Amino acid sequence: MQMWFSQYHTVNVKLDVRIQEQLFSGQSDYQKIDVFKSYEFGKMVALDGEIVFSDTDEFIYDEMVTHVPMAVHPNAKRILIIGGGDGGVAKELIKYPSVEHIDVVETDKMFVDVCRRFFPEVACGLEDERISMFYDDGLRFLRRKHDEYDLIINDSTDPLGHTEGLFTKEFYGSCYKALKDDGIMVYQHGSPFYDEDELECRKMHRKVYKSFPISRVYQAHIPTCPSGYWLFGFASKKYHPLYDLDAKRWDELGLKTWYYTTHLHRGAFMLPKYVEDLLEEEETK
């Protein structure tokens, strides 16, 4: 008997993944957590029935939210990760010897424990001595911060349920206040391909565009994400993601990556026409 995991992307489209076995299933105070071993994607974790990452593609997301801003900011020392309980973003950040301190704010302790158990090669990022872990609501944590971080990475899940507050105008305003004068914020921007997802992308871009003087969007191909096409947001008080990219400095670090390069960095901001159009429409409202 074959076992399949199904995730609906719309009422008319779903992704089916053939499963070898279910490794874990549990209900935390915030969400249902499942871990599967699949034939195609290796181990993968799902929250409330939606794939968060898998063995085969987590490196794409984690590298793109980390190395894009780090190749632009000349000296990011203090960093905040909101979400990030799997440890993947922290794993990439601790590659930088210049990083002095990283705060990780995660709501769900069970999710962290599950990732440490089943994805130790990812969660190892949380074990570095520069990491401080907080189990708290991201927005509540941010309200207490002012002029503190060089970089904020919003690594939360979709804008629903207990993470909904991390996609509001207040949240982006709080990020702005928590950043230093030349700070950068990076966040997942979702997929613009399906109509319902496009609406969320539009709303998100409109809020960030009004909150930061520099707001750009970039892209990556992530197979387990809805439509396989994923956007990220880059918002900054000072630095432009292309004009201020210091490719020579980043390349000389010699960091090992599987997806990100400084050549790809430039190309990631070259968006399809339909995506450019929908973003520009929101900028004129």
Swiss-Prot record:
Which HAMAP family does the annotation name?
Spermidine_synth
A GO biological process held by the record: spermidine biosynthetic process
What family classification does the UniProt entry report for this protein?
A: Belongs to the spermidine/spermine synthase family.
- EC main group: transferase
Q: Identify the stretch annotated as signal peptide in this record.
A: none
Q: Output this protein's name.
A: Polyamine aminopropyltransferase
**Which parts of the sequence bind spermidine?**
D86, D155, S156, T157, D158
* Molecular function GO labels: spermidine synthase activity
Q: Where is the PABS domain?
A: 2-237
From what organism does this protein derive?
Answer: Agathobacter rectalis (strain ATCC 33656 / DSM 3377 / JCM 17463 / KCTC 5835 / VPI 0990)
The yes or no answer to whether the keyword Chloroplast is present is: no
| Protein's gene | speE
